[in-house]
Amino acid sequence: MIPHRQNVLAALTGIITGRIAQINAVYRGGPSFYFYHRILDLRRQYPTVGAFLASTTCIEILYAALVSWDMNSRGAKMKDYDDFRNNLQGNINVFQSVEAAANGCTWANRSPVVQALADLYDRLSLMKTKKKLVSNSKTMHFVFPAL
């Protein structure tokens, strides 16, 4: 356990939010930055995960965001778009379970959302390779940015 955890988290949050413009200027720009903000904007436009994943545009931008974040380079190979889309849309009910568990979630009652996220992680199959840590965690962040 981290001593004074809440104080440490509050301090880190303050640093990040207070310096976000500087952080953004130093780190990623270009296509990855564009698609990251585009997917977050789209997620805000679609208040339910079911509506978000039913949108062809949202799935396409999600795919492009992952590609721009190097998910289809070096050893990482994403599935073809149709397989990617089918896996996401075939798991809408699992995404909706995360959404339901996250509603009203607090640190004290986090177990249901953690379990729902673990279930979703296990069900996602977005890569041609068996490696899925980065692709699945990025996808889950793009779809559930508040978690």
For each predicted feature, which ranges?
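An N-terminal alpha-helical hairpin/helix-loop-helix interaction module that forms a charged
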Residues: 1-129, 146-147
